[in-house]
């Protein structure tokens, strides 16, 4: 009797433990399933918000910004709508229309490029649009051409002035060299004249010295012949 009571008690305890473990497993699986559903919904929501934000950034990059528009408000709203885990999208590259407007002034944007099909022609539509833009605003093109001509004229004027300066410097160098050669030639001529004068003076002095020697010799001979032999008679 006691053994049967113990056996029933053990069976009841094992059944209770199995039921409690199964209930805990079911609750944990339901919680995990709900958690996985919530995370997938959040991920899908973040993906949708990121794609909307990216398209909005592209539209803002292609549309011209007005003067009275406040870009800080839109940036702050986009920052609030942007999910936390997604990095900010890269800025769009500059299109050909912005380059054309920067070169030729404020012009209307060209129509978007269409996809080529089998019925499309061989010509390029972008060249036609640029020609239409130039034809619609010739004033900016004339101003740009005028500025180019002014730049060329300034370059030519600078080259001409540089050539004139070089030519004047060359003439001055030649004149200074000619003056130095003339001074040197005058100095050498003066020295040659001085040498010739000194040579003639030296020759004259030599002749005068010889004449003085001859005169002194003749005077000595006369003195010897005029000597008295006796003093007075008795």
UniProtKB/Swiss-Prot annotation:
Residues 165-184 are annotated as: Basic motif. Signal peptide: none annotated. Disruption phenotype: Slightly delayed flowering. In the plants missing both FD and FDP, fd-2 fdp-1 strongly delayed flowering, even in the presence of high FT levels. Residues 191-212 are annotated as: Leucine-zipper. The keyword Lipid metabolism does not apply. Its main location: nucleus. The modification Phosphothreonine is found at residue 231. InterPro entries: bZIP, BZIP46-like, bZIP_sf. Keywords: DNA-binding, Nucleus, Phosphoprotein, Transcription, Transcription regulation. It is found in: Nucleus. GO terms for biological process: positive regulation of DNA-templated transcription; regulation of photoperiodism, flowering. Residues 163-213 form the bZIP domain. A motif (Nuclear localization signal) lies at residues 152-159. GO terms for molecular function: DNA binding; DNA-binding transcription factor activity. Self-interacts. Interacts with FT and FD/BZIP14. Interacts with CPK33. Transcription factor required for the transition to flowering promoted by FT. This is bZIP transcription factor 27. It comes from Arabidopsis thaliana.
């Amino acid at each position: 009797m006691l053994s049967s009571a113990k056996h029933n008690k053990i069976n009841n305890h094992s059944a209770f433990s199995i039921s409690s473990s199964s209930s805990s497993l079911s609750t944990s699986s339901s919680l995990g399933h709900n958690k996985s559903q919530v995370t997938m919904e959040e991920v899908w929501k973040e993906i949708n918000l990121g794609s909307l934000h990216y398209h909005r950034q592209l539209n803002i990059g292609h549309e011209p910004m007005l003067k009275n528009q406040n870009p800080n408000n839109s940036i702050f709203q986009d920052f609030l709508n942007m999910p936390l885990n997604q990095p900010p999208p890269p800025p769009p590259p500059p299109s050909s229309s912005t380059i054309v407007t920067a070169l030729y002034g404020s012009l209307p944007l060209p129509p978007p490029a269409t996809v080529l099909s089998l019925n499309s022609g061989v010509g390029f539509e972008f060249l036609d649009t640029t020609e239409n833009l130039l034809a619609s605003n010739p004033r900016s093109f004339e101003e740009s051409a005028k500025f180019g001509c002014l730049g060329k004229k300034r370059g030519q004027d600078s080259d001409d002035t540089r050539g004139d300066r070089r030519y004047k410097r060359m003439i001055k160098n030649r004149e200074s060299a000619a003056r130095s050669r003339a001074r040197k030639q005058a100095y050498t001529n003066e020295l040659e004249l001085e040498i010739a004068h000194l040579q003639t003076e030296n020759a004259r002095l030599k002749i005068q010295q010889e004449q003085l020697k001859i005169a002194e010799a003749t005077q000595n001979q006369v003195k010897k012949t005029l000597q008295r032999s006796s003093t007075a008679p008795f």
